[in-house]
Amino acid sequence: MNELKKNITSMYNDEGKEWLDSLPDITAKIANEHNLSGLTPVNNMTFNYVASGYQNDKPIILKIGMNSKALTKESSCLKAFAKHATAEVIADDTNMIIMQRAVPGSTLKAHFPDNDIDATKILCESIKELHKASIPESHNFYHLSELFKTLDQKLDIPDEILSKAKHLRDKLLSTTTEEVLLHGDLHHDNILKNGDRWLVIDPKGFIGDPAFEPAAYLCNPIPELLQENQPREIIENRINICSAELDIDSRRIADWLYAKSVLCWAWSLEDNLDASYWHNLLEMIENFSPCT
């Protein structure tokens, strides 16, 4: 809950504080309307309030957010990915989603760092399943090109890093030969154990290059990855596994990682959050993606 409070107050100031204060009333109203019980806040909240509980006897997750547009998009994306390893949407509204809860619900982060090879293969299986989904004929999902327009803004990022990221972005976008519906944020905490299978949550929903999908996983978990003795070797191994399992060129995966990391740096600056992790990561992976 502390990270949620920090992020919301940093992004929304007094409006964010008011929303946080109103959460008990909002939660109680939703619980009453949808017959929810046993609601318990989860430990890893970042930008949305999330609680586990039950609807009758069915395990559920309740997600409430300030950004109704983002939640509406997430719900649409979960529905587009239906039957492709994602959580089922039970009910939704402008500021909330009630969805299937994974049981036992342990995340892929439990495999880090000791079983990172296995975790990366699980990631790849999840990606394969997700990318079987068709792009809906009518949708509100942005193309990756729209997402990366953020890099064209005036940003407090060193020129050589920003220029390289823009170069890689342009090269990758212009050489994309296949486009799929992307999860867009497929890191460890968004892949959960559900029985003997794995369930994906929290899709962002973008259209674009399949090679972009591993990027979120490659730079996570934050901050634990960079606290390891050999984080560079971990990332290199992950890239090689993803390349082999997904039949995607390793350089292309590495280039998207670099561009995505600079984008995350830009987002951190926009949201008044600490961006040091991204600076440190980019220094470490600099020669993964030579600017050619």
Annotated model-derived regions:
Residues 1-86, 285-292:
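Conserved NTP-binding catalytic cores of kinases and kinase-like/nucleotidyltransferase enzymes
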Residues 18-31, 132-184, 194, 244:
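An alpha-helical support segment within catalytic cores of ATP-dependent transferases
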Residues 24, 57-98, 106-130:
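A conserved alpha-helical element in kinase catalytic cores
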Residues 45, 93-97, 206:
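Short glycine-enriched loops at secondary-structure junctions
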Residues 48-54, 89, 166-212:
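Active-site acidic catalytic loop and adjacent metal/ATP-binding pocket
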Residues 67, 98-114, 132-135, 148-156, ...:
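A glycine-centered beta->alpha junction motif in the catalytic cores
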Residues 194-240, 247, 274-290:
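Active-site Asp-x-Gly
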